[in-house]
Amino acid sequence: MEARAQARYIRVTPMKARRVVDLIRGMDATEAQAVLRFAPQAASVPVGKVLDSAIANAAHNYDHTDASSLVISEAYVDEGPTLKRFRPRAQGRAYRIRKRTSHITVVVSSKEGTR
């Protein structure tokens, strides 16, 4: 049994989001929620929301209400489209600013031996 959740077009750079996702990959779901709650990175908020959604999907789709018996089997961040902006500089020049977006995916599954 596995349940997945995905958040797309999140305005956080993929590199920063991957730092947070690497923290929780392979953890128990409740332990990962606690880690994300106290993580100082700003990307921990959207990753936490995706994890909560994956746990809720497991409860809804499979009547799997016990979150402590779920483990994060997959968690990854893909790069979304980049918003391009320009900052005016001296003598008619302009610097390009890239505002990157992320697609965050979390898959939870039941631990081995539990149903």
Swiss-Prot record:
Q: Which domain of life is it from?
A: Bacteria
Instruction: Return the InterPro entries for the record.
Output: Ribosomal_uL22, Ribosomal_uL22_bac/chlpt-type, Ribosomal_uL22_bac/org-type, Ribosomal_uL22_CS, Ribosomal_uL22_sf
SUPFAM superfamilies this protein is in?
A: Ribosomal protein L22
A GO molecular function assigned to this protein is: rRNA binding
Q: State any GO BP term from the record.
A: translation
* Transmembrane residue ranges: none
Q: Name one Pfam family in it.
A: Ribosomal_L22
Q: Which UniProt keywords apply?
A: Ribonucleoprotein, Ribosomal protein, RNA-binding, rRNA-binding
Question: What does the record list as coiled-coil region(s)?
Answer: none
Q: For this UniProt entry, what's an example GO CC term?
A: cytosolic large ribosomal subunit
The reply on keyword Ribosomal protein is: yes
In the record, the note on similarity to other proteins reads:
Belongs to the universal ribosomal protein uL22 family.
Q: What does this protein do?
A: This protein binds specifically to 23S rRNA; its binding is stimulated by other ribosomal proteins, e.g. L4, L17, and L20. It is important during the early stages of 50S assembly. It makes multiple contacts with different domains of the 23S rRNA in the assembled 50S subunit and ribosome.
Per UniProt, subunit arrangement is:
Part of the 50S ribosomal subunit.
Report the protein name in the record.
Answer: Large ribosomal subunit protein uL22
Which species does this protein come from? Streptomyces griseus subsp. griseus (strain JCM 4626 / CBS 651.72 / NBRC 13350 / KCC S-0626 / ISP 5235)
The gene coding this protein: rplV
